[in-house]
Amino acid sequence: MTSTTWDPSQYLRHADHRSRPFHDLVNRIPTTPRRITDLGCGPGNVTATLTDRWPDAVITGVDNSAAMIERAQQDHPGIRFTLGDIATHRPDTDLLLSNAALQWVPDHADLFPQWIDALPVGGTFAFQVPGNFRSPSHTLLADLRNSPRWAGHLAGAERADVLEPAEYLDRLADLHCTVDAWETTYLHVLTGPHDTPGGLVLDWMLGTGLRPALDALPDPEQRAAFLAEYGELLDRAYPATPHGTVLPFRRIFVIAVKQ
């Protein structure tokens, strides 16, 4: 899995909006697992809520960011969190869960056979990934990243795409799973101060989608110039309204139960 520098505090700035898809995914899981592994657990804020649904389960969170694991261990000492690469992790578990993480793993669908093989019969693989890579927040970022001014600095700062729900369904059905796949577009209404270019949408992107670009621009002046240019583009694509800035965000959900 590609190494990216993460800032747990920045990520958690929109925790209420970011956590909603996780709860929508978990609420549809039909099984009662004894062991749960959360791949790409981040700061552990949503991993910890799994005890509400399954209070007797043994829960483990895995992430490749030392900063995220440190924050998770600090905030949720009752849950086991471990540093690891989710692309190579082989958990012994009844429920393999991943929330908004697999998009960072190139060719992640090619890993499905070994993950399903590791599950017991009746075990569940459930995940959610963003499906908004064709939205302005991402297409504008890609265009700017590939522009003459920035292409030389940001080569390789892209990230993997995701499949469509029907493609995930086919892949997992071929592995003898019963599959529930769907998509939802959330209309996040972002509110609060937004006196810098890009405002609240830029603040959201700073927690996730911008991380590879920020890693590729260690010079503070270059980074500030890039963010200012990107922020101006976001302001035009996501204008503020009297009730806040509306950020449409498509998500893809899959629950596969091994037969």
Where are these regions (language model features)?
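A short SAM/SAH-binding and catalytic strip from SAM-dependent methyltransferases
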Residues: 95-109, 131
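Conserved catalytic/acceptor-binding region of the Class I
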Residues: 109, 124-195
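Short glycine-centered segments of the SAM/dcSAM-binding site in methyltransferase folds
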Residues: 35, 123-124
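Short, conserved SAM-binding segment of the class I
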Residues: 110-115
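Helix-to-beta-strand junctions that scaffold the AdoMet/dcAdoMet cofactor pocket
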Residues: 105-106, 119-121
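Conserved Class I S-adenosyl-L-methionine
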Residues: 43-45, 161-259
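Conserved class I S-adenosyl-L-methionine
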Residues: 1-37, 45-49, 68-71, 142
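Class I SAM-dependent methyltransferase SAM/SAH-binding core
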Residues: 35-89
